[in-house]
Amino acid sequence: MRIVEVVDARGHENVQSTHRATFEVTRETRLTRRGDCVVAVGAMKGAADLNLRFKEAARKDNARITITIEADEVKEVVRAKGNSRLSFTHPMDLVVRRSGYVCGRTVAVGADKAASHFSRKLVEKMRDPCQKIKITLTVES
């Protein structure tokens, strides 16, 4: 089974994309320079808003989750895993982790990339407040 979830967001001048363990997309519209894992703001969805079918499929320990982040022609693909402990309860944030840590904000674990691994070309685009960013989450179980 393959389920796709699309989240639209935008860039922000304070995007750092330097965190080594996670990356985050948030519904918040403000961002300080301390938010070094945040790669997009103004998202249309938080973890709690994701489709029920997506959540159920991602809660399987053998689920494969692919996250594609696109800004115009520049894109990054991240491969991660599902986990039976995912709760998808946070109303504001979507967090992808390299580790196995799970909380209400977590949408995938065991990722092969974090914010610091994104191309600097993409990061430059993510620093533009007018830049539309498309995040596509695909779960296969």
Task: State what each model feature region is.
Residues R2-V6, H12-N14, T22, D128-K134, ...:
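N-terminal intrinsically disordered, low-complexity segments enriched in P/E/S/T
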Residues G11-T32, T66, E70-R97:
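A low-complexity, Ser/Thr/Gly/Pro-enriched, surface-exposed linker/loop concept
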Residues T29-R33, A58-R59, S99-Y101, R127:
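Solvent-exposed alpha-helices and their adjacent loops that cap or buttress functional pockets
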Residues R34-V41, F54, C103-V109, V123:
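Short, recurring structural edge motifs at helix starts
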Residues G35-C37, D61-I67, H90-M92, R105, ...:
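A generic structural signal for short beta-strands and their flanking turns/coil linkers
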Residues V38-R79:
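Short, well-structured hydrophobic secondary-structure segments
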Residues A43, A71, R98, A111, ...:
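Short, structured patches in soluble enzyme cores that scaffold and shape functional sites
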Residues D49, V74-V123:
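Short, solvent-exposed interaction modules
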